[in-house]
Amino acid sequence: MNLSELIPETHYIQINLSDLLDQLGEDEVKEILSTFSCPINADVEKFLKEKAIEFSKREFSKTHLVFWETENKEEKEFVGYYTIAYKHITIDRKAINYKEARKLREHGIYNEKSSTYTIAAPFIAQLGKNFSN
């Protein structure tokens, strides 16, 4: 028995909100988002319905919608979403040793004027399950 036999085939797909907007247009995407319901966390629902499109357009964050699809791929059900955002972290050069500074040079931007490194740190800004079904 190989590993693929042990792992069930998944029928979940993720679609980037920006890609969906390009393909379907804002009105149709808003219609899809309107089907989302999260009664246990109103902020999660409000973000998706009122801010996610604008945040995607302005590149503040990237939202991905998760759909379950039938085996024949004819039907899709909106089951949830997640949003990735970036926080910029500033680190004073004097607060770290040479080895750490060398690592930061690979991943961040050094500002000679302020003697600081700035790095982008991704985080899950929103995570929501659709309870409408």
At which residue positions do the language-model features occur?
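Non-catalytic substrate-recognition and accessory regions of acyl/acetyltransferase enzymes
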Residues: 1-132
